Curated annotation (Swiss-Prot):
Homotetramer or heterotetramer of pore-forming glutamate receptor subunits. Tetramers may be formed by the dimerization of dimers. May interact with MPP4. Forms a ternary complex with GRIP1 and CSPG4. Interacts with ATAD1 in an ATP-dependent manner. ATAD1-catalyzed ATP hydrolysis disrupts binding to ATAD1 and to GRIP1 and leads to AMPAR complex disassembly. Interacts with GRIP1 and GRIP2. Interacts with NSF via its C-terminus. Isoform 1, but not isoform 3, interacts with PICK1. Interacts with CACNG2. Interacts with GRIA1 and SYNDIG1. Residues 592-607, 608-610 dip into the membrane without crossing it. Residues 25-543, 638-812 are extracellular. It is a multi-pass membrane protein. The modification Phosphoserine is found at residues 683, 717, 860, 863, 880. It comes from the Eukaryota. A lipid is attached at residues 610, 836 (S-palmitoyl cysteine). Residues 1-24 form the signal peptide. The gene is GRIA2. The lineage of its organism: Eukaryota, Metazoa, Chordata, Craniata, Vertebrata. Residues 565-591, 611-616, 834-883 are cytoplasmic. Disulfide bonds join 78-330, 739-794. This is Glutamate receptor 2. It is found in: Cell membrane; Postsynaptic cell membrane; Postsynaptic density membrane.
Length: 883
């Protein structure tokens, strides 16, 4: 583009000179353009073509230079003067303004400029730009500001600042004036951020930006970066091109932005020009082919019209103007002024035309008068004219009624962009989405909700998935919002229908509806393996302490029964035969020896019968209370036994956030960008603060980019990672196969999901009313049941729990079999021991008897001994043996 301009600059004078150089109708015009002023130069060329007449032609001589370089400006001005130009159009800044005005006054060469107006009287300087001081002061009074910051660019001069300070002294305003004109370009971003942070400390939230477009854009970028573009801030852009800047990026932040506009796009003259301007080729006319034009370019175009009209008036007055013989050295000493320069100056000041900048008229000092400046405010639907300012009427407000926030008229012909995020079950791609188009590709809770909202509000909508896959958080360093919140703040979407949590920091930059779903932060862990029943799981229905007490009670009852049986005379009785005859012995017997007492207590406890029972009242009392005791214990045991044997229990390693914070074996984290992370970062509760300290410093990072990644990490970590997320999502995933996650503990907080719209959006109130209506109709609960439970894959208990809880496995009762086998083995062992013991004892007795027989031989004695042996050791006989 620069090369094209340089070639045009070199060729234009030659071409114009070849065509008109020998013609008396050719009027030489100089041009001093700063580098980078492509659009201004294109507007100048368009004006030259547009306003050329058959009477005369304006022939330009263009120099492209650094206007801040006084030496370059001097050389260019003198070069133009030596070429015999009739007038010079150009730009200046604070460093070159004195040089140019001095040459103009000395040489009587008129200088037409769209640069900032100068103070005082400067002959031969025609200023196309209207003075902004009056309009700015009126706007400050309209907003009733009494304390604000004033950021100015010293390149534009200090006249406006001086007028503001004079009014401040008179009206007792508190003004903080800051010069941003000398800020180093290499460090400008950092310095702008530091500047606004200092203003924040001073509670300065009203700021006037008296700068040109490029510097305003740089400042606005940093204002957005540090989050000072939200509700509560008010900025006035003190130049004449309110729509020239990139307002889209600050449009939805919530801050009030006001300014001034000299080019009225509603004017028919401007509309016709824009029609032609937008058809120009960008390559031939750099900066053209757009539907807008910078105010400096518009003033440049108007300047060509003013010069053309001035020379036309001179022709009508038959005043002959010629530079023949008058082209000389501007540095001559003494300087030789151009004699006819005064006539041209007078003609220029007498011009009165309608241009792109409105009514163009000058006073005797070459300054604009009788002009009108539009007052603008930035709304969510773009810049809006709220009034105008003129020298006669001063501040006039024409916008008396602001559009209602509930007004959705005009949306019928607009497709509302709905931003959302792929998150099950809120928004999911259909299985056959590749065969579908538009909104039909998606399904889920929020998809159904968006359809209901659109039906109630009466608009068409288009679902779009957020590009970065994030919900929305502000970067701690750059202060830039990402995710769905960022798309709303920066105007990429009209509404967000997603599981977006309502938080304070988000509420500062966007608007939320009433919550359509309530929830809280919860803990997700991998479902622990169901514990296999132990060998002695049949003991689980009663605590081990109870079993110990039962054993002691059993022993105690047996001992008491033994004692009362010994002391009670009614337990002693003589032994009787089966036919009723009493024994010949006078000795009484007692059946409740210590072993029989133990046997009786055991039989009663096991609910089995026993051959013996107490005869005495005291013994029966002991037996009765023992039977009552065993009745209650056995009934309680039986009631709990079924549940303990048929239900496989899961033992969770953690049950609450406190459990997580007290250990380091299980890692835990949150979504990397969202309200859950922000909750822990801002929390002052000791447990949550401790958890945040751990999460922030954990290596490897415990934060995940998406919820799906967090769930996958839980499933793959073998119980060594816990994921903190919203309870609704936790409950949904718990109902999805492979059914291996679970929610533990209660919610850590209470919050809600809301539908978000840009600050001040006309959709806000309508969406809010729609949510309330859907809630009253019960549709929100119906949608949740549909996507959470009706489509669940794990059942109420998870997995195949119904089949598993109804059947007993061998492992459940293995201990009983072990006891049975152990008891049988013990019985056999005891029997063997008894046999061996008795055999050994009888062998010894037989040996003693044999020895005695050898000493006293007697057949009768032998017969008696044999009988005794037979009676005591008839192991294999059929007769009963009583030992």
């Amino acid at each position: 583009m620069q090369k094209i301009m340089h070639i045009s600059v070199l060729l234009s004078p030659i071409l114009w000179g070849l065509i008109f150089g020998v013609s008396s109708n050719s009027i030489q015009i100089g041009g001093l353009f700063p580098r980078g002023a492509d659009q201004e130069y294109s507007a100048f060329r368009v004006g030259m073509v547009q306003f050329s007449t058959s009477e005369f032609r304006l022939t330009p001589h263009i120099d492209n230079l650094e206007v801040a370089n006084s030496f370059a400006v001097t050389n260019a001005f003198c070069s133009q003067f030596s070429r015999g130009v009739y007038a010079i159009f150009g730009f200046y800044d604070k460093k070159s303004v004195n040089t140019i005005t001095s040459f103009c006054g000395t040489l009587h060469v008129s200088f037409i400029t769209p640069s900032f107006p100068t103070d005082g009287t400067h002959p031969f300087v025609i200023q196309m730009r209207p003075d902004l001081k009056g309009a700015l002061l009126s706007l400050i009074e309209y907003y009733q500001w009494d304390k604000f910051a004033y950021l100015y660019d010293s390149d534009r001069g200090l006249s406006t600042l001086q007028a503001v300070l004079d009014s401040a002294a008179e009206k007792k305003w508190q003004v903080t004036a800051i010069n941003v004109g000398n800020i180093n370009n290499d460090k400008k971003d950092e310095m702008y951020r530091s500047l606004f942070q200092d203003l924040e400390l001073k509670k300065e939230r009203r700021v006037i930006l008296d700068c040109e477009r490029d510097k305003v854009n740089d400042i606005v970028d940093q204002v957005i970066t540090i989050g000072k573009h939200v509700k509560g801030y008010h900025y006035i852009i003190a130049n004449l091109g309110f729509t020239d800047g990139d307002l889209l990026k600050i449009q939805f932040g919530g801050a009030n932005v006001s300014g001034f506009q000299i080019v009225d796009y509603d004017d028919s003259l401007v509309s016709k020009f824009i029609e032609r301007w937008s058809t120009l080729e960008e390559k031939e006319y750099p900066g053209a082919h757009t539907t807008t034009i910078k105010y400096t370019s518009a003033l440049t175009y108007d300047a060509v019209q003013v010069m053309t009209e001035a020379f036309r008036n001179l022709r009508k007055q038959r005043i002959e103007i010629s530079r023949r013989g008058n082209a000389g050295d501007c540095l001559a000493n003494p300087a030789v002024p151009w004699g006819q320069g005064v006539e041209i100056e007078r003609a220029l000041k007498q011009v009165q035309v309608e241009g792109l900048s409105g009514n163009i008229k000058f006073d005797q000092n070459g300054k604009r008068i009788n002009y009108t400046i539009n007052i603008m405010e930035l709304k969510t639907n773009g810049p809006r004219k709220i009034g105008y300012w003129s020298e006669v009427d001063k501040m006039v407000v024409t916008l008396t009624e602001l559009p209602s926030g509930n007004d959705t008229s005009g949306l019928e012909n607009k497709t509302v962009v709905v931003t959302t995020i792929l998150e099950s079950p809120y928004v999911m791609m259909k299985k056959n989405h590749e065969m579908l188009e538009g909104n039909e590709r998606y399904e889920g809770y929020c998809v159904d909700l968006a359809a209901e909202i659109a039906k109630h509000c009466g608009f068409k909508y288009k679902l779009t998935i957020v590009g970065d896959g994030k919900y929305g958080a502000r970067d701690a360093d750059t202060k830039i919002w990402n995710g769905m919140v960022g798309e709303l703040v920066y105007g990429k979407a009209d509404i967000a229908i997603a599981p977006l949590t309502i938080t304070l920091v988000r509420e500062e930059v966007i608007d939320f509806s009433k919550p359509f779903m309530s929830l809280g932060i919860s803990i997700m862990i991998k479902k622990p393996q169901k514990s296999k029943p132990g060998v002695f799981s049949f003991l689980d229905p009663l605590a081990y302490e109870i079993w110990m007490c039962i054993v002691f009670a059993y022993i105690g009852v047996s001992v008491v029964l033994f004692l009362v049986s010994r002391f009670s005379p009614y337990e002693w009785h003589t032994e009787e035969f089966e036919d009723g005859r009493e024994t010949q012995s006078s000795e009484s017997t007692n059946e409740f020896g210590i072993f029989n007492s133990l046997w009786f207590s055991l039989g009663a406890f096991m609910r089995q019968g026993c051959d013996i029972s107490p005869r005495s009242l005291s013994g029966r009392i002991v037996g009765g209370v023992w039977w009552f005791f065993t009745l209650i214990i056995i009934s309680s045991y039986t009631a709990n036994l079924a549940a303990f044997l048929t239900v496989e229990r899961m033992v969770s390693p953690i049950e609450s956030a406190e459990d997580l914070s007290k250990q380091t074996e299980i890692a835990y984290g949150t979504l990397d960008s969202g309200s859950t992370k922000e909750f822990f970062r801002r929390s002052k509760i000791a447990v949550f603060d401790k958890m945040w300290t751990y999460m922030r410093s954990a290596e490897p990072s415990v934060f995940v980019r998406t919820t799906a990644e967090g769930v996958a990490r839980v499933r793959k970590s073998k119980g060594k990672y816990a994921y903190l997320l919203e309870s609704t999502m936790n409950e949904y995933i718990e109902q999805r196969k492979p059914c291996d996650t679970m929610k533990v503990g209660g919610n850590l907080d209470s919050k809600g999901y809301g539908i978000a719209t840009p600050k001040g959006s006309s959709l806000g109130n309508a969406v809010n009313l729609a949510v309330l209506k859907l809630n009253e109709q019960g549709l929100l609960d119906k949608l949740k049941n549909k996507w959470w439970y009706d489509k669940g894959e794990c059942g109420s208990g998870g997995g195949d729990s119904k089949e598993k809880t109804s059947a007993l496995s061998l492992s459940n009762v293995a201990g009983v079999f072990y006891i049975l086998v152990g008891g049988l083995g013990l019985a056999m062992l005891v029997a063997l021991i008894e046999f061996c013991y008795k055999s050994r004892a009888e062998a010894k007795r037989m040996k003693v008897a044999k020895n005695a027989q050898n000493i006293n031989p007697s057949s009768s004695q032998n017969s008696q001994n044999f009988a005794t042996y037979k009676e005591g050791y008839n192991v294999y006989g059929i007769e009963s043996v009583k030992i």
